[in-house]
């Protein structure tokens, strides 16, 4: 048994596994409904509603929160040592993981729209920048992400109510348009799991 195996927390693996299963179940359920499946009208139909039900985003939120815990454990030694070389090495580990997940998730989204992998990669890239911050600053960043998302939605609703077009902000498809601007807005604001507000879970 290696040192990594001895120090690995099985609780995180269990949570990650349960969250992944939940994400797959909810995504596949939504896919079947879009293909004409019958959800029914009972209480379970409401609970497992992939868009408005109480479980609609819970598994994805747990998935991102567990990723944040994993980042804390991965970077703990480097942060505690204060060694810039160790910090840089861990930062590049996060960047590589983020780029891989971002690229794979981007192409997967062409086949299966709405997956979290695309945004999961963006979360790791954000974590590579943020992991050296103190807890209070991380809390400020997370709260700012949530408040920023709420402010954007409020502004868009207010503008639309006064007859202004807000589709450039809230609607778009980077996979179709191949636009860097659409890609940025998809990741930050209007995707299924954008950095605003989902960064609060990391």
Can you say where each PLM-predicted feature lies in the sequence?
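N-terminal signal-anchor module of multipass membrane proteins
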Residues: 1-76
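Residue-level signature of transmembrane alpha-helical entry/exit and packing/kink sites
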Residues: 16, 93-97, 101, 138
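Aromatic-anchored segments of alpha-helical transmembrane domains
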Residues: 24-28, 102-109, 145-155
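Specific transmembrane alpha-helix
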Residues: 61-76, 117-131, 188-202
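Short juxtamembrane and helix-loop transition motifs at transmembrane-helix boundaries
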Residues: 71-88, 99-109
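Membrane-interface helix-loop-helix modules in multi-pass inner-membrane proteins
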Residues: 89, 93, 100-130
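Solvent-exposed interhelical
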Residues: 126-144
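Long hydrophobic alpha-helical segments that form multi-pass transmembrane helix bundles
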Residues: 141-202
């Amino acid at each position: 048994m290696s040192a990594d195996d001895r120090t690995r927390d099985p609780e995180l693996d269990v949570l990650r596994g349960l969250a992944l299963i939940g994400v797959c179940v909810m995504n596949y359920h939504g896919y079947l409904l879009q293909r004409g499946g019958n959800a029914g009208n009972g209480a379970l139909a409401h609970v497992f509603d992939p868009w408005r039900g109480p479980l609609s985003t819970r598994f994805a939120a747990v998935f991102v929160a567990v990723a944040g815990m994993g980042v804390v454990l991965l970077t703990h030694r480097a942060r505690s040592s204060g060694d810039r070389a160790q910090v840089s090495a861990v930062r590049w580990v996060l960047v590589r993981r983020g780029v891989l997940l971002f690229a794979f998730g981007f192409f997967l989204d062409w086949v299966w729209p709405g997956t979290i992998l695309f945004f999961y990669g963006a979360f790791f890239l954000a974590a590579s920048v943020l992991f050296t911050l103190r807890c209070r600053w991380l809390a400020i960043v997370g709260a700012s992400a949530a408040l920023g998302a709420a402010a954007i939605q409020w502004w868009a609703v207010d503008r639309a109510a006064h007859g202004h077009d807000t589709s450039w902000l809230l609607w778009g498809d980077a996979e179709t348009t191949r636009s860097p601007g659409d890609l940025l807005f998809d990741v930050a604001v209007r995707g299924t799991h954008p950095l605003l507000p989902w960064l609060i879970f990391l």
